[in-house]
Amino acid sequence: METRATLRGVRLSVDKGRLVADLIRGKKVDQALNILNFTQKKAAGIIKKVVESAIANAEHNDGADIDELRVKTIYVEQGATLKRFSARAKGRGNSISKPTCHVYVVVGN
């Protein structure tokens, strides 16, 4: 039995998200939440909410036992990039890219 949760379009670099996702892949959910609590990264708080959502989905929709759940799959994909413009001296301009990503979490036995 597998249950999933997704978060799309979050303002986070895909590389920074993957760095945290690699920490909890394959771990039990209580151990994964403990790791995320003590990881001092912006991505840790975002991914923690998605993992908690997947746990709640498994408990409510499938009636799963929380103690047996593991993070089976977690991956972070690149989303759309917000492109902005910053005015510079002498009529020039620089482009600023603000990346987004999508977080997918699958929990199961």
From Swiss-Prot:
<dbReference type="InterPro" id="IPR036394">
    <property type="entry name" value="Ribosomal_uL22_sf"/>
</dbReference>
<keyword id="KW-0699">rRNA-binding</keyword>
<dbReference type="InterPro" id="IPR047867">
    <property type="entry name" value="Ribosomal_uL22_bac/org-type"/>
</dbReference>
<comment type="function">
    <text>The globular domain of the protein is located near the polypeptide exit tunnel on the outside of the subunit, while an extended beta-hairpin is found that lines the wall of the exit tunnel in the center of the 70S ribosome.</text>
</comment>
<protein>
    <recommendedName>
        <fullName>Large ribosomal subunit protein uL22</fullName>
    </recommendedName>
</protein>
<dbReference type="InterPro" id="IPR001063">
    <property type="entry name" value="Ribosomal_uL22"/>
</dbReference>
<dbReference type="Pfam" id="PF00237">
    <property type="entry name" value="Ribosomal_L22"/>
</dbReference>
<dbReference type="InterPro" id="IPR018260">
    <property type="entry name" value="Ribosomal_uL22_CS"/>
</dbReference>
<dbReference type="GO" id="GO:0006412">
    <property type="term" value="P:translation"/>
</dbReference>
<comment type="subunit">
    <text>Part of the 50S ribosomal subunit.</text>
</comment>
<dbReference type="GO" id="GO:0019843">
    <property type="term" value="F:rRNA binding"/>
</dbReference>
<comment type="function">
    <text>This protein binds specifically to 23S rRNA; its binding is stimulated by other ribosomal proteins, e.g. L4, L17, and L20. It is important during the early stages of 50S assembly. It makes multiple contacts with different domains of the 23S rRNA in the assembled 50S subunit and ribosome.</text>
</comment>
<keyword id="KW-0694">RNA-binding</keyword>
<comment type="similarity">
    <text>Belongs to the universal ribosomal protein uL22 family.</text>
</comment>
<keyword id="KW-0687">Ribonucleoprotein</keyword>
<dbReference type="InterPro" id="IPR005727">
    <property type="entry name" value="Ribosomal_uL22_bac/chlpt-type"/>
</dbReference>
<dbReference type="GO" id="GO:0022625">
    <property type="term" value="C:cytosolic large ribosomal subunit"/>
</dbReference>
<keyword id="KW-0689">Ribosomal protein</keyword>
<dbReference type="GO" id="GO:0003735">
    <property type="term" value="F:structural constituent of ribosome"/>
</dbReference>
